[in-house]
């Protein structure tokens, strides 16, 4: 089987480095290029010591030179959108782990997939446990009408609430089909997080954390808590590998890893 050639955008970031390390360990995936605004040399040594790959801040140049099948993007929305447009113009499939996109930007990404006849997946979270957490929260939403989401991340995360928290609330509302219950009285509404049709979403940013989320349901005489904890970025890699392998066989736009898992 011919290896899938992959370029990593955001290669010097922590997620980008983890992706490169994983690509080196996978028999059917081949890292062929790296892009980052901090690139200062034309080549980036691979984590396993097997050689080096083209490295530049100029995405178009790297794509032209390496002709990859897939670009993996873990950056920020402000940097990601221009890169997505460039990669789509080069007919490169995309696996996007960046969060913080506006609804308008998501619509543009979907249109880019159609116009350029490529596959694009945007996933707020690649941890399989987190995907299952959202699925379980959806199931609970069918029966329990009061819920809140608390997401906790490291203090360097720029967007809040997290993409996973927003996707969780949206999935819960879609499954329930109506708004969740709101408290009858709130004296300090600004202390209650961001509201999404009755679901309050709270964000915590502290050093020492990585990525954690819990969904708490309440009903008369009981509560249900569904929680996921990510202790290292390694937990995201099986989902990233799955997305890379699937997106080369997919045309169009996919939002969420759950679609590939068929949950």
UniProtKB/Swiss-Prot annotation:
Pfam families hit by this protein: DapB_C, DapB_N
Listed GO MF terms: 4-hydroxy-tetrahydrodipicolinate reductase; NAD binding; NADP binding; oxidoreductase activity, acting on CH or CH2 groups, NAD or NADP as acceptor
Transmembrane segments: none
Enzyme class: oxidoreductase
Catalytic residues (UniProt): 153 (proton donor/acceptor), 157 (proton donor)
InterPro entries, sorted: DapB_C (IPR022663), DapB_N (IPR000846), DapB_N_CS (IPR022664), DHDPR_bac (IPR023940), NAD(P)-bd_dom_sf (IPR036291)
Disulfide topology: none
Protein name according to UniProt: 4-hydroxy-tetrahydrodipicolinate reductase
Organism from which the protein derives: Dehalococcoides mccartyi (strain ATCC BAA-2266 / KCTC 15142 / 195) (Dehalococcoides ethenogenes (strain 195))
Taxonomy of the source species: Bacteria, Bacillati, Chloroflexota, Dehalococcoidia, Dehalococcoidales
Gene field: dapB
């Amino acid at each position: 089987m011919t290896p899938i050639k992959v370029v990593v955008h955001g290669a010097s970031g922590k997620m980008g480095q983890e992706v490169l390390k994983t690509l080196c360990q996978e028999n059917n995936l081949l890292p062929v290029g790296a892009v980052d605004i901090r690139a200062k040399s034309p080549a980036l040594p691979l984590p396993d010591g097997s050689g080096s790959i083209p490295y530049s801040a100029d995405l178009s140049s790297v794509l032209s030179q390496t002709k990859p099948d897939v670009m993996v993007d873990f950056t920020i929305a402000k940097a990601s959108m221009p890169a997505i447009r460039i990669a789509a113009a080069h007919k490169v499939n995309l696996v996007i782990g960046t969060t913080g996109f506006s609804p308008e930007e998501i619509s543009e990404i979907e249109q880019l997939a159609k116009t350029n006849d490529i596959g694009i997946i945007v996933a707020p979270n690649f941890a399989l446990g987190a995907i299952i957490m959202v699925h379980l929260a959806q199931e609970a939403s069918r029966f329990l009408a009061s819920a809140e989401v608390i997401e906790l991340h490291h203090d360097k995360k720029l967007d809040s609430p997290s993409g996973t928290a927003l996707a969780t609330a949206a999935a819960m509302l879609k499954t329930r089909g109506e708004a969740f219950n709101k408290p009858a009285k709130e004296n300090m509404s600004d202390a209650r997080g961001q509201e999404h049709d009755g679901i309050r979403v709270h964000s915590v940013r502290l050093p020492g954390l990585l990525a954690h989320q819990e969904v708490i349901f309440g009903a008369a005489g009981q509560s249900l808590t569904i929680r996921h904890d990510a202790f290292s970025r390694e937990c995201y890699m099986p989902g990233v590998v799955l997305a890379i392998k699937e997106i080369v066989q997919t045309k169009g736009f996919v939002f969420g890893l759950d679609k590939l898992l068929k949950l």
